[in-house]
């Protein structure tokens, strides 16, 4: 039986040396929300707790300012 090898998750923000996640950086924030608009949990993305809190805050600010949609499921 072959064992499935899962690539080790790492925090992209720690690797790049980011000090603060900017709510105006929509391209980066879109990588951390699902198609339905939910914030992706850190156990999936591998983001550290410190940056996950900053990420959630930045996404919520961007949503409030209409830079990001709350949901994409409008029909």
UniProtKB/Swiss-Prot annotation:
Pfam families named among the record's database cross-references: Ribosomal_S18 (PF01084)
A single Gene Ontology CC term: cytosolic small ribosomal subunit
Xref: InterPro entries: Ribosomal_bS18 (IPR001648), Ribosomal_bS18_CS (IPR018275), Ribosomal_bS18_sf (IPR036870)
Keyword Calcium belongs to the record: no
Molecular-function annotations in GO: small ribosomal subunit rRNA binding; structural constituent of ribosome
UniProt KW keywords: Ribonucleoprotein, Ribosomal protein, RNA-binding, rRNA-binding
GO biological process terms, semicolon-separated: translation
Subunit structure: Part of the 30S ribosomal subunit. Forms a tight heterodimer with protein bS6.
NCBIfam families: S18
Function as written in the Swiss-Prot or TrEMBL entry: Binds as a heterodimer with protein bS6 to the central domain of the 16S rRNA, where it helps stabilize the platform of the 30S subunit.
Family: Belongs to the bacterial ribosomal protein bS18 family.
Entry protein name: Small ribosomal subunit protein bS18
Taxonomic classification: Bacteria, Pseudomonadati, Pseudomonadota, Gammaproteobacteria, Alteromonadales
Gene: rpsR
């Amino acid at each position: 039986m072959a064992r499935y090898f899962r690539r080790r998750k790492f925090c992209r923000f720690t690797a790049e040396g980011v000090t603060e996640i900017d709510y105006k950086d929509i391209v980066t924030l879109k990588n951390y929300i699902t198609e339905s608009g939910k914030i992706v949990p850190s156990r999936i993305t591998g983001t550290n707790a410190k940056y996950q809190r900053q990420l959630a805050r930045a996404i919520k600010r961007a949503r409030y300012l209409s830079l990001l949609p709350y949901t994409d499921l409008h029909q």
